[in-house]
Structure formats: structure tokens, C-alpha cells
Amino acid sequence: MADVKKVVLAYSGGLDTSVILKWLQDTYNCEVVTFTADLGQGEEVEPARAKAQALGVKEIFIDDLREEFVRDFVFPMFRANTVYEGEYLLGTSIARPLIAKRLIEIANATGADAISHGATGKGNDQVRFELGAYALKPGVKVIAPWREWDLLSREKLMDYAEKHGIPIERHGKKKSPYSMDANLLHISYEGGVLEDTWTEHEEDMWRWTKSPEAAPDVPTYVELTYRGGDIVAIDGVERTPAQVLGELNRMGGENGIGRLDIVENRYVGMKSRGCYETPGGTIMLKARRAIESITLDREVAHLKDELMPRYASLIYNGYWWSPERLMLQQMIDASQTSVNGVVRLKLYKGNVIVVGRKSDDSLFDASIATFEEDGGAYNQADAAGFIKLNALRMRIAASKGRNTLK
């Protein structure tokens, strides 16, 4: 262990990472630098400073990354209308490359030769953190305690904390039975009763959203203004990216929007059930499809849809910093120059309903699409030749006896 002199630890201040901090100090006999990120998880991050100081940490980084998170990670991802396996909006996945980036930046700034994280050896996060770290700093050493130590239960972690004088909270507050992760895009729940795929989640599990049954009986209308594929204003009031997502979370949560219960395929090979609340993201996805429906060329839109599952898998599996993701991002971003305008939505009891869309860059031409007299804008007789030419290969096949009729 003598080759490790200084480690940057992704530190939440909770039991797991506090034990990891002390374990790193004792096992590697090294200096530990802590990094705590505010990604909009809704918890105080400053208490992590006092806990780190109590464990002898001299260099402590606590960073408000909310704007960077939404501007440089969430918004670019949503430009692709990204969904993993048809449902998951990648709330956890998209936060990991930013944390990895900041870990490496701090390692470079402090002269650390290693980084460490609290992800377990069973999940996707270990892959996401480490792929990002190696992409940004090829020679960095990564220490993953959950793959090295024998503290494989909460009871063992508690015993270790008590033995080594690590401050832990014992204020009688009922601990959630779920493993949770939160940021400005979503909150996730795993474990507990959710490990039985037949058992319904409990209503009191949800923290951000009302149940659709308890949502207001009167719908909420909202207008979202897009510029270059990103939301820049809500109801005509300009907002920063983090403010946009925060306000949509509030509106969506109030109207019972954004709950999800799925079984997903983890990159490490197992299936895992998770429940998610993504109110703002659910609204953004619906609105983006609406504004693109009038501003994107048909073939561009279809190509984006074809490539989206690949793009989603790259993010889910931890390849945000890979050359293929960066290549796809350039193509996606190039498609967004005309994605400008306003989408009007009705939010009602778990539903996001598009009720209007307009744009100065719209490709929708009412004079051509009308069911009424179009004044010669579209010659319906032209359709006969179009159909015959497109049927040519099938007509030839049928003439050779290859039709499907018996």
C-alpha cells in the first residue's frame, strides 16, 4: 500500500463513506481528501465538512454542482430524448460522469495519486465512476473498498464505526428500508420489499410526488420556451437550467407526475428492480418530443430515434466520456439548431398532456396539411407515381412468385 500517498474520496458524510474514510487512512496509511457534491439531492452537505474534520481530514471540497449538472449533463442527454429500456430516464447514471470528472480535477489540483468511491461491487456505479476516471486520467489508481474489505453488512459497518470512534447518528429517526439515491433529476429506491417483484411499493415510500389519486382535481397549464433544444423559460420567465428542472420537479410532483416502477438490466449482468421519481424529467421528455415534432426534418427525427437506444446504453453503462458518446453528442447537438419555440402542456393527475406547440422554425405547413381546399399547394394526383415507384420492388417480387398469399 506504500504506493498510495493521497486519495480523493467521494464523500457523502453518511455511514458508508465515513467508514471508508477511516478505513483508507488505516489500510493505506495515506492522506484522504474529501469531495462532497451538491447535485440537488435535497440534503444538507455542510455537515459532511464537520464529520471529515473530526476524522482528521485537512483538505475538504464541498461543491455546488447543480447548474453544471443540469447544463452540461442533463440537458445534453435530454436533447436525444434519452430513455433506457423504454422507461428509465437515467437519473443516477447521468450524475456519475460529473462526479468522476470532479474527482479527477481535485486529484490533479491536490497532487493525489488515487481516488476512491463507495459503490458496491454488485452495481453499475462502480463501472461508471471508474470508466470515467480512467478516461480522464489513465494512470489514476482507483480504490473500491467494497471490493476489498470484509465489512459486508450494515451491522459490520456500525461495529467498525463504534470501534474507531466514527461519529454516527443515533437520534431514533426511523431509517428508510430502501437504498436511495437523489439528485436534481430524480430520486431512486431499491432494496427492501422491492426485491420481491410481485410486491407493490408502499405509498409512503415516495418523497417528491403526490399519488395521482391525491393530486389536484384542477389541471395545471404551463408553457415551456425552447432555444437550441433546451428549455430557457417557464411561462415566459427566463430561468437557469437548474431553476428550470427544480420548478418542473415542483409542478410535476404536485400533479402526481413522474413515478416509475421497473426491472432493469444492469451492465454487470443482473436484473434489478427500482422505483424512481422523475417529475421534471418526465415533463421535459414529453415537451421535447412535441417541439421536435414541428421543427425537425422527418429523417433527422427518425435517425435520432434509431440511435437513441445506443446513446442511452452508453450513458447507463458508464461511457459518457467515451469517443463514441462524444461523436453521437455532436450529431445530436447539430440537430437542435432549429429546435426553438414554445410548448404548452396540461399537467393532470399523473399525466403530461401536450395541448399546443408553436415555433418560428416550424416545418408544419397548414396550407399543405389541411383537409380543406388547399389552393393547389398539394397535387394529390402526384401520389399515384410516388406509390407505384415505392411498390416497384414488391411488384417485381410478386411477379416472381414471392408474394405471401397462399
UniProtKB/Swiss-Prot annotation:
Localization of this protein: Cytoplasm
CC annotations in GO: cytoplasm
HAMAP family reported in the protein's UniProt record: Arg_succ_synth_type1
Subunit relationships: Homotetramer.
Residues annotated as binding L-aspartate: T120, N124, D125
Keyword Membrane: no
Gene3D superfamilies: Argininosuccinate synthetase, chain A, domain 2 (3.90.1260.10), HUPs (3.40.50.620), Single helix bin (1.20.5.470)
E.C. no: 6.3.4.5
Pathway participation: Amino-acid biosynthesis; L-arginine biosynthesis; L-arginine from L-ornithine and carbamoyl phosphate: step 2/3
Name recorded for this polypeptide: Argininosuccinate synthase
Disulphides: none
